[in-house]
Structures are given as C-alpha cells and as structure tokens.
A protein has these predicted regions:
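Hydrophobic "anchor" residues on beta-strands that sit immediately upstream
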Residues: 197-198
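Conserved core of the PLP fold type I
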Residues: 50-194, 205-206
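Walker B catalytic acidic pair
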Residues: 201-202
C-alpha cells in the first residue's frame, strides 16, 4: 500500500502540474460578484451622525449592526460590527480573557481547557494551542454536538472555559446545529458555570 501511494505521488510530480489548492480561497467568479460594491456612492455620515470616514464607534456602524441583528434574529444592542474575519474576532476574544478574565485571568489557570467538536477547524485548535489551552474533542452528530458527551465531559472536574464551534455549515463536515441542539448546549454549559463561554464562529452564516 505504501509503495503504491509513493508511486502515484511520483507519477503526479512528473506531470509538473500547477494547481492552487489553497483552502477556502474564493474563485475569480465569486470575487467578481462584489465588483460593483467598489463603485457605490454611499453617505458620508451614518444615521446617528458619525462621519464614516473617521474613526468609528467601538461597537461598529449602527447600520451594519442592524443588518447583523436581522441576520442573527437578535436585538441590535447585542450586535457588534467588528473585523471582517471571524477567526480574528475569536482570537481577540480569547486573548482578552487570557489576560483579563474575571475573577481570574485564563493565563493563571493550571490546565485550562476548551470543548471542540470534531471534525472541526484546525485553525481553532492551533489558536487554542498558542495560548496553552487544551482542545478537548467531543463528537458531532446529525443535528449538532453530542450533548450527552458534552455534559459528561465538562463535569469531569477539569477547568473548562468554553466551547468553540461552527454551528452553521460546520467546517469541514457541513453540519448545521438544530435550534434544539444549541438550546441544550446553552443549558448544559450554563448549568456548569455562568462564566462558560460559547464561541460560535459564524464564518458561513450567510
């Protein structure tokens, strides 16, 4: 088997193919969809009087927050319009808790852990690893996480800080968590601790 794989690999090398297999990179046709946005004429001042060419408000442009509110079916007061990268927002959230979490910064914990459904996003695992946080796997099932396994895992006496997952079109399986699954996740997590952090990477929400 090993020799067969090596032979196939060498055969492909001999063809000197030039293929871009960068993961998650949009096709040119997809990029073209946004071309017209570059030429839009938009107001310079937001509806609450902020000059959009200047530094913005900490929670983001109010019109963008309202759009997020509609997409997420959540109050606009609960929406922050921040970076365009969900991974960066995730990193910043973990960094702030690592340094300043109350009542104890995560950096002061001996064995901090995070729940990570698998299969999952390798960059989530690497991000946690960079902070010395152990990623503890639980299984994905048809409609979301295995809630029984989730409950058993976080109640094993260890220092679980939260869960990091992709509830909508989960990477890489494509699983979408049901409303019932997410509600059960919230119930279990909050019963464990009111400090338990639910980090939903909604990169594929739309």
């Amino acid at each position: 088997m090993h020799q067969e794989i090596i032979a196939r690999f060498n055969s492909l090398k001999e063809k000197q193919l030039s293929i871009d297999i960068t993961r998650g990179k949009p096709d040119t046709n997809q990029l073209d969809l946004s071309n017209k946005l570059l030429n839009l004429s938009i107001p310079l001042v937001s509806e609450n009087g902020i000059d959009l060419r200047n530094y913005g408000e900490p929670f983001g442009i109010v019109e963008a927050r309202r759009l997020g509110s509609e997409l997420l079916n959540a109050p606009v007061e609960n929406i922050i319009a921040g970076e365009q990268s969900s991974l960066l927002l995730t990193y910043q959230t973990i960094l702030s808790n690592y340094l300043f979490a109350e009542p104890l910064a995560w950096k002061s914990l001996k064995k901090p852990k995070f729940i990570c459904p698998v299969p999952g996003f390798d960059r989530h695992f690497k991000l946690l690893e960079d902070f010395g946080i152990e990623a503890v796997p639980i299984s994905l099932i048809e409609d979301g996480i295995n809630t029984q396994q989730f409950e058993e895992t976080i109640n094993d006496g260890e220092e679980y800080l939260g869960i990091l997952c992709v509830p909508r079109h989960s990477n890489p399986s494509g699983t979408t968590y049901s409303d019932e699954n997410i509600k059960k996740m919230f119930e279990i997590g909050l019963n464990f601790s009111n400090k338990f952090l639910f980090l939903f990477d909604h990169a594929y929400l739309i």
